[in-house]
């Protein structure tokens, strides 16, 4: 989903800002759909090299956008005087914010496993998600309030940030795209029990491109709400498994007996995701709590059933 949205976004940005014919939009989606996966195709070193260039460039764009918006609205007094045309409930707003980063956060270990130490991994994650992602959310919300326009492409056009914005936005989207498809490949290889990472990467790019061609760009808000509902329960299962079942200490990978799938985890996840999706309250929190509680209950039920089976077999002897 994210890959499809990013692919469609950069194609639409180029067509609008460079005044290209509308007929170029779909071919550009195909071009970027497969082009964005090149660094992920190379591997982690490709991701790292691109990020070293793109992150500073995106920081410059964010600062420029904030400064321009502040100037256009007339400073802090002008900003406080703006009355939004539409409103969201607090629960929906929180769900949308969760949706912007929860997918990447849940799969962050795909990158942090390359860190020099666990301390570096933790701090890098905290800085990246809270400061980096937080700054991007603030910038997007700031522009939406000032210009009464939720579309980031239209905001950049209104600010007059044309060519520089195209280059910086392109780099930023590329870092999002290659990390997204890298995660897809890692999960896909694990699911399919294959080491053909590059083939899975291309397959993911193909699916993402099809979704982009199908109109994913228009579905960003519903997609964020969906992500904010169905992804957080995964974290609930992981936390319950780590802190409750394994008491905060997983066995070494070489010594662990890994099942083909965790039936308890899957059942708890489905229950948590369903409750989050249909909940009238803050969906991500509901999903995490329900999934974690369900996993603990199912685990204890399984352990009790196994204990009774052992006792029955012992008595039979």
Annotate each predicted stretch with a short phrase.
Residues 17-42, 56-65, 89-105, 130-137, ...:
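Transmembrane alpha-helical segments of multi-pass small-molecule transport proteins
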Residues 235-317:
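C-terminal membrane-solvent junction of multi-pass transporters and transport-like membrane proteins
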Residues 1-20, 174-190:
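Hydrophobic transmembrane alpha-helices that form the core helical bundles
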Residues 131, 135-177, 181, 188-194, ...:
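TM-loop-TM module centered on a large, flexible mid-protein loop between adjacent transmembrane helices
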Residues 68-72, 81-143, 157-178, 259-273:
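Hydrophobic, membrane-embedded alpha-helices of multi-pass small-molecule transporters
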Residues 12-15, 24, 40, 56-82, ...:
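Hydrophobic alpha-helical segments and their helix-loop junctions in multi-pass secondary transporters
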Residues 9-20, 32-54, 110-116, 186, ...:
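Membrane-water interface regions at transmembrane-helix termini and the short interhelical loops
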Residues 27-32, 36-69, 84, 122-129, ...:
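Membrane-interface loop-to-helix entry segments
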């Amino acid at each position: 989903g994210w890959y499809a949205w990013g692919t469609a976004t950069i194609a639409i940005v180029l067509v609008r800002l460079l005044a290209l014919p509308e007929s170029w939009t779909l071919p550009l989606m195909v071009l970027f759909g497969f082009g964005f996966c090149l660094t992920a195709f190379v591997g982690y070193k490709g991701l790292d090299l691109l990020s070293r260039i793109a992150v500073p460039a995106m920081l410059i764009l964010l600062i420029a956008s904030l400064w321009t918006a502040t100037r256009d609205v007339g400073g802090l007094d002008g900003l406080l005087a703006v009355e939004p045309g539409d409103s969201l409930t607090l629960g929906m707003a929180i769900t949308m914010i969760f949706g912007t980063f929860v997918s990447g956060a849940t799969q962050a270990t795909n990158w942090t496993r390359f860190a020099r130490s666990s301390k570096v991994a933790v701090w890098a994650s905290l800085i990246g998600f809270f400061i980096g992602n937080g700054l991007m959310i603030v910038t997007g919300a700031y522009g939406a309030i000032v210009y009464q326009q939720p579309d980031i492409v239209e905001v950049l056009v209104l600010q007059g940030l044309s060519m520089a914005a195209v280059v910086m936005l392109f780099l930023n989207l590329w870092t999002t795209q290659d990390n997204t498809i890298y995660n897809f490949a890692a999960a896909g290889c694990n699911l399919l029990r294959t080491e053909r990472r590059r083939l899975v990467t291309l397959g993911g790019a193909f699916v993402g491109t099809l979704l982009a061609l199908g109109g994913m760009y228009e579905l960003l808000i519903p997609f964020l709400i969906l992500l904010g509902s169905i992804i957080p329960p995964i974290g609930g299962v992981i936390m319950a498994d780590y802190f409750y079942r394994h008491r905060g200490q997983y066995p070494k990978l070489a010594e662990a007996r890994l099942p083909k799938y965790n039936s308890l985890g899957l059942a708890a996840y489905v229950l948590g995701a369903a409750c989050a999706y249909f909940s009238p309250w803050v969906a991500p929190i509901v999903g995490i709590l329900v999934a974690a509680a369900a996993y603990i209950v199912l685990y204890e039920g399984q352990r009790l059933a196994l204990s009774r089976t052992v006792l029955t077999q012992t008595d039979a002897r």
